[in-house]
Amino acid sequence: MKTLLLTLVVVTIVCLDLGYTLKCNQLIPPFYKTCAAGKNLCYKMFMVAAQRFPVKRGCIDVCPKSSLLVKYVCCNTDRCNN
């Protein structure tokens, strides 16, 4: 009985992921990385002249402002920067 209870506690801890971390796509979407502590946004960066293809993707702490040449799109859920 104690073994069953211990197993349930361990499974619960693993499933809850107590130290939640964000996962963001890298430049090639099938590949993603787990963001470091404090990096709570995913981002996608485009060149304004060619918005069809992102130049960079990853984790970031603050979403940068877009400029005349570069556009940033940020989000805060797992792998949302497709």
UniProtKB/Swiss-Prot annotation:
**Where does this protein reside within or beyond the cell?**
Secreted; Target cell membrane
Quote the cellular component terms of the Gene Ontology held in the record.
extracellular region; membrane; other organism cell membrane
- Please name the taxonomic classification of the source: Eukaryota, Metazoa, Chordata, Craniata, Vertebrata
Which cysteine-cysteine pairs are annotated as disulfide bonds in the entry?
Answer: 24-42, 35-59, 63-74, 75-80
Name by which UniProt lists this protein? Cytotoxin 6
The signal peptide stretch is 1-21
Name the UniProt key words of this record, in alphabetical order: Cardiotoxin, Cytolysis, Disulfide bond, Membrane, Secreted, Signal, Target cell membrane, Target membrane, Toxin
Its tissue distribution reads: Expressed by the venom gland.
The UniProt subunit note reads as follows:
Monomer in solution; Homodimer and oligomer in the presence of negatively charged lipids forming a pore with a size ranging between 20 and 30 Angstroms.
Role summary? Shows cytolytic activity on many different cells by forming pore in lipid membranes. In vivo, increases heart rate or kills the animal by cardiac arrest. In addition, it binds to heparin with high affinity, interacts with Kv channel-interacting protein 1 (KCNIP1) in a calcium-independent manner, and binds to integrin alpha-V/beta-3 (ITGAV/ITGB3) with moderate affinity.
Pfam families assigned to the protein according to its UniProt record, in alphabetical order: Toxin_cobra-type
